[in-house]
């Protein structure tokens, strides 16, 4: 199997990070949620998860240099007043590492943790190898005790070749244990196993085989509804209410056939970060799905930290994609026409 060593390292890293995040979520208080410079929420789990994954990848793949494109950095952890927070993060990191026998004697200092977090400052690109990480994707859901993902992917020469995603709050259909670990390698299919690593072997996942769009289900965020989604659903004749899920867990739900359509249309000028889509995209693609922009072009992860695409992200099955793209084009044209009419009034 290609990238066998990398996949094993990624699964170990993500599993340990998920363990850390679960411990934080169990005892999380609103006072534990901080704001970054861009006003988005961040918790000890975001920093701790990134530190664990950075440390495990560096150790498991030594002597290969680690280039990590990740959401967090340790800038705020160097500021006055951050020492107590950093100390709690360091304790979480060491507890998570100690839960794995091969890391039982691997104790990190506060400075080690900051350095591990700051490995995530790589800019990615079209050459070399870059790991892409969202240490806690869906922090808003995480702080409410709801779904979130720990999402890691490997970019080689500008192409995503491997993805691992922990979904600690997603029900496992094949096991009584909670939590799922999804993984995929290019050309090898997508799989899911229990996050707790029980005796059940990994199961191959496949997207839904529904051919009639009227029978399809949207998967959407738990935030407010987006009007264009309703327009597209009406054109396809979809009657079922959407499945509401936070974060990249939406990709996982679609990959195993829980839903058939995931759309992401953001405000004009917003640029998508690659760590919000890389792992989910390859898992869904390897499960037989299609991930593209609203023009039907594949997503390009080789342009640095951001995706360079024109309009929206569209995820669905091969059966439904042609009719879905047609409905999207018609809905966008109608929206533009309505905007032009309102401007003239």
Curated annotation (Swiss-Prot):
Cofactor requirements of the protein: Mg(2+)
CDD domains: PAP_phosphatase (cd01517)
GO biological process, any: sulfur compound metabolic process
Binding site for AMP: 247, 250, 264
Gene Ontology MF terms in the entry: 3'(2'),5'-bisphosphate nucleotidase activity; inositol-1,4-bisphosphate 1-phosphatase activity; metal ion binding
InterPro entries for this protein: DPNP, Inositol_monoP_metal-BS, Inositol_monoP_superfamily, Inositol_monophosphatase-like
Pathway membership, UniProt: Signal transduction; phosphatidylinositol signaling pathway
Keywords, alphabetical: Hydrolase, Magnesium, Metal-binding, Multifunctional enzyme
Binding locations of Mg(2+) 3: 71
EC number: 3.1.3.7, 3.1.3.57
Residues reported in the UniProt entry to bind adenosine 3',5'-bisphosphate: 139, 247, 250, 264
SUPFAM superfamilies, per database record: Carbohydrate phosphatase
Annotated binding of Mg(2+) 1, by residue: 71, 134, 136
Reaction catalysed by this enzyme: 3'-phosphoadenylyl sulfate + H2O = adenosine 5'-phosphosulfate + phosphate; adenosine 3',5'-bisphosphate + H2O = AMP + phosphate; adenosine 2',5'-bisphosphate + H2O = AMP + phosphate; 1D-myo-inositol 1,4-bisphosphate + H2O = 1D-myo-inositol 4-phosphate + phosphate
Record's protein name: Probable 3'(2'),5'-bisphosphate nucleotidase 4
Gene: SAL4
